[in-house]
């Protein structure tokens, strides 16, 4: 036997009414509803903030200042030297 019987639900309802009283249940439900509304509002605010930051990044503006483009450091170019020829050895010894 599970909680599918109507008698189980009636007994649970009576116990809840005895524990909390008839006046406390509507206040409890009102507090739950306020909590749900605050949660939804917070989620909507987060989505708006995220959308605003994404659109600011697309425009290249963050906090009202233009974004700076950062380039990778460039290595100084060294002038190209012509390839060196191997030294010429002359024999000072007489031939012949």
UniProtKB/Swiss-Prot annotation:
GO: which molecular function terms?
protein transmembrane transporter activity
Which Gene Ontology terms describe the biological processes this protein takes part in?
protein transport by the Tat complex
Where does it mainly reside?
Answer: membrane
Q: Which domain of life is it from?
A: Bacteria
Q: Which InterPro entries match?
A: TatA/B/E (IPR003369), TatA/E (IPR006312)
Could you state one GO cellular component term attached to this entry? Answer: TAT protein transport complex
User: Compositionally biased, Basic and acidic residues: which spans?
Assistant: 56-65
Task: Give the membrane topology.
Answer: Single-pass membrane protein
Where is the stretch described as Disordered? 42-96
Entry keyword set = Cell inner membrane, Cell membrane, Membrane, Protein transport, Translocation, Transmembrane, Transmembrane helix, Transport
What spans are recorded as compositionally biased (Pro residues)? Answer: 73-86
One Pfam family of this chain: TatA_B_E
For the keyword Transmembrane helix, the answer is yes
Question: Among its keywords, does the record have Metal-binding?
Answer: no
Localization, UniProt: Cell inner membrane
Spans through the membrane = 1-21
Subunit structure of this entry? The Tat system comprises two distinct complexes: a TatABC complex, containing multiple copies of TatA, TatB and TatC subunits, and a separate TatA complex, containing only TatA subunits. Substrates initially bind to the TatABC complex, which probably triggers association of the separate TatA complex to form the active translocon.
Annotated function = Part of the twin-arginine translocation (Tat) system that transports large folded proteins containing a characteristic twin-arginine motif in their signal peptide across membranes. TatA could form the protein-conducting channel of the Tat system.
Family, as annotated: Belongs to the TatA/E family.
Q: What is this protein called?
A: Sec-independent protein translocase protein TatA
Q: Which organism is it from?
A: Rhodospirillum rubrum (strain ATCC 11170 / ATH 1.1.1 / DSM 467 / LMG 4362 / NCIMB 8255 / S1)
Gene name, please? tatA
């Amino acid at each position: 036997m599970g909680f599918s019987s109507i008698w189980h639900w009636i007994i649970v309802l009576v116990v809840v009414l005895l524990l909390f009283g008839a006046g406390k249940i509507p206040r409890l439900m009102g507090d739950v509803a306020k909590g749900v509304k605050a949660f939804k509002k917070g989620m909507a605010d987060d989505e708006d903030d995220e959308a605003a930051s994404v659109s600011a990044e697309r425009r290249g503006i963050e906090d009202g200042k233009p974004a700076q483009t950062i380039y990778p450091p460039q290595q100084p170019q060294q002038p190209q030297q012509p390839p060196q020829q191997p030294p010429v050895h002359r024999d000072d010894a007489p031939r012949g």
